[in-house]
Amino acid sequence: MYLCGLPALVLNRMFPRWARYSPLIGLFTVCAALFISAYARNVTELIITQGVFYGIGGAIAYMPCIMYIDEWFVKRKGLAYGIMWSGTGLAGVGLPLILEKLLEVYGYKTTMIIWAVVLFTITAPLAWYIKPRVPPLPVRRLKAFNLRFCLSRRFILYQLSNTIEAIGFYIPGIYIPIYAASVLGAEEFAQALCILLFNISSVVGCIGVGWLIDRFHVTTCVMVSTIGATLGTFLLWGCAFNMPMVFVFCVSYGLSAGSYSTTWTGVMREVAGKDMQSSSTPSSLTGGEAGDVGGGNGDNAGPPRPAESPLSEFTGSYSEEVDPIMVFVLLAAGRGFGNVISGPFSQVMYHSMPWKGEAALAYGSGYGSLIVFTGVTALGSGICFLGRRVGWC
């Protein structure tokens, strides 16, 4: 899903009038993939349905949401994105329990069919309300994206921080329940509670960081997340000798690391241009037309943009020639890349279990290397903060 953002963005920019229907198309693809996966007979078929097609459908459904929020919100854009991204954690609070109960009662096949039907029934009507601020005009062709920013020192530092954070971010969500069961003897409910606490905390964290990103520089917000995740990992998980400490770590990690992606709004602002213009113009208007619309009496009205700006066909939120949604897409790809390479590393550390019986506290439980790896990658996510201090971004 992370890696399909680029083609989804290109298609939505090429056919802006059809972009509004992308959420419905994507939702249908996602639900169809779930429905078909109920009849999967092997792992390969599961990867194709719940992996490939589910991810493609998710990207198609998700991209217009990112695009339109950028158009609808200006002053509180970070808070708007934070509230939207908090929905991921909110869904993770009750959904795992519901699916687990369905699996116990009805089995895998029936559960997948039920969930596919219920998901489409609930979300399809809501997709109608996902729309641009002003209906776009048809465009004949898509101008080339300005990708020069990819080679800028500023973007490279932000992307490096983002990818390093992603490499270790998913490890606690996978191994904390295993650690709780194998080391502390936790029951199934306590294991599930770890994930629930993380998801609930990430809801609060995303909204909080979204509020901060509208008021402070993005590197400051990144450092808040970095410090919380790093200290929480080394001090709380590293010293977790009972379940209450594990629960405290899950809350701390959800508040800090779980909200890291909300800082992308600030990165979009920094890379695409700090001077934010009016969002009251449709994404396909250019030159004088955009100026006529943007020059109204609204509070968010701004000056007309130059007719030659390639961005005039993309968004009305930024004055530079860089599409901020392209910045988002590449950051998402970096996070996806970090997630992919995290798996092999964590598997090796989990099976080798170094320092077991040799180090103190949780570091000697066999999970010490996972704890250190998670903490180091969390610390590495603050590279962009250091880069700004020395004038690199």
Predicted segments — roles?
Residues 30-37, 43-64, 68, 163-164, ...:
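Hydrophobic core of transmembrane alpha-helices in multi-pass small-molecule transporters
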Residues 51, 58-73, 80-81, 259-289, ...:
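Intracellular juxtamembrane helix-capping segments at the cytosolic ends
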Residues 76, 83-134, 165:
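Helix-loop-helix hairpin linking two adjacent transmembrane segments in secondary transporters
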Residues 16, 39-41, 73-74, 185, ...:
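Helix-breaking motifs and short loop linkers at transmembrane-helix boundaries and internal kinks
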Residues 2-19, 205-218, 236, 350:
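Helix-to-loop junctions at the C-terminal end of transmembrane segments
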Residues 13-27, 214-227, 242:
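Cytoplasmic membrane-interface "Motif A"-like loop-to-helix N-cap segments
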Residues 152-223, 260-265, 339-351:
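Extracytoplasmic gate region of multi-pass secondary transporters
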Residues 28-41, 227-241:
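C-terminal ends and interior cores of transmembrane alpha-helices
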